[in-house]
């Protein structure tokens, strides 16, 4: 897909702050530091529209990125970080649950996992949460360039089995460094965002 225009439109913590207009939305979920910002930047050919951070838990709001004036990527707070108070985690959990369970414009979710390691308990819970609410899921296994090519299929199989993925759900190996998986990711996303 040729992205001509991309902008961060709003950062929201509650429904009244979400953008209106009914454009389709794709949520991006994943552990802190799994590479969500790098994924967004690679997908839209920008270096730093989505700010990358080495500090886990940097994204504390739902960030709505309007792409080509036609749909949104919604970057949701990363999970699985230790340095945040239980109260903060609870607040973020409530915010995410409200978004995922009530947002009609939400058409699909991208769950990002780190290809180098088996998915975490939090990854499994997130996948099950999305399936429970019947939100279509595309799993993106990031940092593929950090895994030797000969081991890609083995790591992908471990990810599929750990998440207990449904047969029809795509698992795409992705690298923000090399661009691997970018075309496949767009191919999987377009049916949900083409209006």
Swiss-Prot record:
Indicate the segments forming the EngB-type G domain, all copies.
22-195
- GO cellular component annotations of the record: cytosol
Q: Which residues bind Mg(2+)?
A: 37, 59
Keyword presence, Transmembrane helix: no
Q: Which SUPFAM superfamilies match?
A: P-loop containing nucleoside triphosphate hydrolases
Q: Which GO terms describe its biological process?
A: division septum assembly
User: Could you say which residues bind GTP here?
Assistant: 30-37, 57-61, 75-78, 142-145, 174-176
Keyword Cell membrane on this protein?
Answer: no
UniProt keyword annotations, A-Z:
Cell cycle, Cell division, GTP-binding, Magnesium, Metal-binding, Nucleotide-binding, Septation
Known cofactor(s)? Mg(2+)
The family database entries (InterPro entries) matched by this protein are listed as: G_ENGB_dom, GTP-bd, GTP-bd_ribosome_bio_YsxC, P-loop_NTPase, Small_GTP-bd
Source domain of life is Bacteria
MF terms per GO, please?
GTP binding; metal ion binding
Q: Name one Pfam family in it.
A: MMR_HSR1
* Entries under PROSITE patterns matching the protein: G_ENGB (PS51706)
Q: Which family does it belong to?
A: Belongs to the TRAFAC class TrmE-Era-EngA-EngB-Septin-like GTPase superfamily. EngB GTPase family.
- Cited NCBIfam families: GTPase_YsxC, small_GTP
Q: What role is this protein assigned? A: Necessary for normal cell division and for the maintenance of normal septation.
Per its record, how is this protein called by name?
Probable GTP-binding protein EngB
Q: Which organism is it from?
A: Geobacillus kaustophilus (strain HTA426)
